[in-house]
Amino acid sequence: VPNTESNILHQQVDLDRLNKNKDNDPITQKLIKEDKMLLFITLTQKCQLNCGYCGNGSNEDIEDIVAHNPEVIYDVNLIKKFNKVKDLAVCFYGGEPLLRIPLIEQIIPLLPNAKFCLQTNGVCLKQLKPEIVRKFNTILVSIDGDEATTDFNRGKGMYKMLIKHCKWLRENCKFTGDLIARMTCSGINDIYKSVTHLLNLGIFDHVHWQLDVEWDSDMDARYTNHLAEGFVDWKDRIYNVGITNLMKDFIENLKKGKVLGIVPFLGLIKIFIKGEKVKRILCGSGSDSFNITTSGYINCCPIAPEIDPIDDIRREDFDHKNLYDTELIAGFCQ
């Protein structure tokens, strides 16, 4: 990095926070010793869809959270610095990462020992080469439940397209990894019906979801409809009731020796079985999970671009071990 740019980078990154003494924290020392990291790589901020709950739509209540360059502007060969991580998992993220398939094909060989993951809206899945598909351990496809729910949120015909593309992964590409239905649960969802529908398709190994509540200046913006009178009403009458019914199904199946692939439940079950007190948030953001932005900065979470960068991959003295346990997330996430 030229000296002038290096000075700018040092101004952007809080080096005192990065280089703070972590020797006396046993949790931090354990993270450094294990050297296990989940690394998101945001390939673009662009997406070809206009989903109803996303900043690409016309809903004027949605805040503009895009704080980074729309496209990758750093030399992706710098990603090779993460080859020093002992146990590395890489997740391609966006925007829509499959709008930048050549970048994916360029990055995968740079990290020969990593495990790879993809989170995608599924539109361009069939543009991937089968040999690239088989490089992935996990593929998360955005689908919100049944056909009516998915098409309402993501556009007419999306549900049938996604089902077709997911079957293509299995049948044509011989993908044997973890295929996850990644829902955005919004005001039109009956969570019990949506999750049960996706599990019963026999296509997905797991179902995971995120609530559509944290991007709006008015949380009730999309929860006042024929189902509910605002978010709290929806949560109490529909969501919590559905979660309770899902848990009942989960327990009944456990008694029969079957574990339903409901991701939020599995994380909690693991904690109960291990009997460990959780001292960091479960997603690992800021402790052992990080994101390379399109600008080359490293922050703790790909869906929180407003958080200050922890480091910059372009710094000559970059050391991935300095990232561990740098950003202790609290507040809303905690």
Regions flagged by a language model, labelled:
Residues V1-Q12:
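N-terminal accessory interaction module
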Residues H10, D14-E131, K135:
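Conserved alpha-helical substructure of the radical SAM core
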Residues K46-S58, C300-I303, I329-Q334:
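Local cysteine-cluster metal-coordination motifs and their immediate loop/turn environment
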Residues E63-D64, P70-E71, K156-I163, K167, ...:
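Radical SAM enzyme [4Fe-4S]-AdoMet core and its adjacent flexible, acidic
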Residues P102, P302-P305:
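Short clusters of small/polar residues that mark proteolytic maturation junctions
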Residues A304-Q334:
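Membrane-interface junctions of multi-pass transporters
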